[in-house]
Amino acid sequence: MENNILTTLNLSIGYISKKETVTIAQNLNLNLQAGKLTALIGANGIGKSTLLRTITGIQKSLQGTVLLNDKKISSYEPLELAQNLSMVLTEKLPPSNLTVFELVALGRQPYTNWIGTLSDADIQIVQDAIAQTQIAHLSQKKHYEISDGQLQKVLIARALAQDTPLIILDEPTTHLDLLHKVSLLKLLKK
């Protein structure tokens, strides 16, 4: 029996502008299963990131349906979606003065009170995510003081700290050397 966590039904992806609709891919049917590592591989510019933005609800589909836990992704409230899906995209972070620890701790935001106070359990989850990604030595550095490869690990730690049933990573090994690519893939397989 399949345990599908995310399903697409006849999904068409692309862009709508004032002048035209550009379809990148159409009639996509896929099933992502809980507990499985799934990779999407393809040439640059063919729509992988567009697909990921669409299946996570960031970008509207041109046609079709995306189901997360058998519920339309468009029907999720933002907080509920953040408790079921975490993602790491390729966009740059907005300017801020956050430390690495604080950036990873943002992954706990869907579970904190209205002022964002971390419980002892939240702090432990953040520390575990930092340990799993081997970035403890960076925790007190400002995120703008670290390399792109280190920042990629920090963003993955944030997704792990979010503790969701589904994690979507767009180009997760970008900026990582071979050793850290292997380490990350081993971590993701757990």
Residues covered by each model-derived region:
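Conserved structural motif at the start of ABC-family nucleotide-binding domains
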Residues: 6, 23-27
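The feature captures the beta-strand-to-loop junction immediately N-terminal to the Walker
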Residues: 41-43
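Helix-to-loop junction immediately C-terminal to a conserved catalytic motif
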Residues: 56
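Conserved ABC transporter NBD signature motif
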Residues: 64-72, 81, 141
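Conserved ABC ATPase "signature" region
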Residues: 105, 120-138
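Conserved ABC ATPase signature
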Residues: 116-118, 142-146, 150
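Catalytic Walker B motif of ABC-type/P-loop ATPase nucleotide-binding domains
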Residues: 167-171, 176
